[in-house]
Amino acid sequence: MHAKAQDLQEMAHFISCYGLNTGPQMAYMGPVITFDISALAYVVTEGTTPDVFFTDEVASIQLIEASDRAMACLRAISDVLDSAVCETRTGDGTWVPDYIEHVSNWAATPPIGATEPPTESEVIGRILRAANHAQTHAA
């Protein structure tokens, strides 16, 4: 199986077992640890949970952006969403796709005209769609 597809399937499995964090930080320590969808991509692909995921969103985003495998998963999920990826302006004035913002925002906030964000089942479904697409279109 293609590594990206396997990573995405692991993400879906984790959410089905432990849930999804949609709170202010990338991770939440409750009875079980839950992760924001972007942080979960990092945890699955890198095999570690950085302490900053609980305390520092900016540092968390920088870590996730530095992980090629996590970003590949987030791009794959972004590709199967109904909305276009948003762009963020960098320090030098260039506009770049912001996959972390796109995917995390989609999973944690209600769409226009709705009062609730996607359910965990809907999030899992999109992740599995991305996994299927990654496996089908693997080179």
What are these regions (language model features)?
Residues 1-21, 25, 41, 46-139:
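Charged interaction scaffolds used for protein-protein
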Residues 31-44:
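Active-site nucleophilic cysteine motif
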